[in-house]
């Protein structure tokens, strides 16, 4: 569960290291985002010469959460931390060209097939 002010790791090579959620998109009073939800983020920590810089405000999709994802068979997939993939504000396609770490099968929608194809492991 991601809410405003939550710090997340970045699971791509866009140049950002840590980001902070500033808004959960989708509904006027929506509080929490889970895996597959789009959030508005600001870059808090970035590497030199990256594609993004500190202070940029962008969109991101949540790919891993500590809370986990419940599957219809009752199993729960949990991760050690919260992570996201940074998206282009207009096209909502990933800025980075590589994805680090596993992602869940819940991302397998038409919008995020690019992330699924770049990921090294889909759980």
UniProtKB/Swiss-Prot annotation:
Q: Which InterPro entries match?
A: Ribosomal_uL14 (IPR000218), Ribosomal_uL14_bac-type (IPR005745), Ribosomal_uL14_CS (IPR019972), Ribosomal_uL14_sf (IPR036853)
Gene Ontology terms: biological process: translation
**Is-annotated flag, keyword Transit peptide?**
no
Among the GO molecular function terms of this UniProt record, one is: structural constituent of ribosome
- PANTHER family, per the entry: 50S/60S RIBOSOMAL PROTEIN L14/L23, LARGE RIBOSOMAL SUBUNIT PROTEIN UL14M
Query: Which family is it part of?
Result: Belongs to the universal ribosomal protein uL14 family.
This chain's function reads: Binds to 23S rRNA. Forms part of two intersubunit bridges in the 70S ribosome.
Q: What is the name listed in the Swiss-Prot or TrEMBL entry for this protein?
A: Large ribosomal subunit protein uL14
Organism, as annotated: Citrobacter koseri (strain ATCC BAA-895 / CDC 4225-83 / SGSC4696)
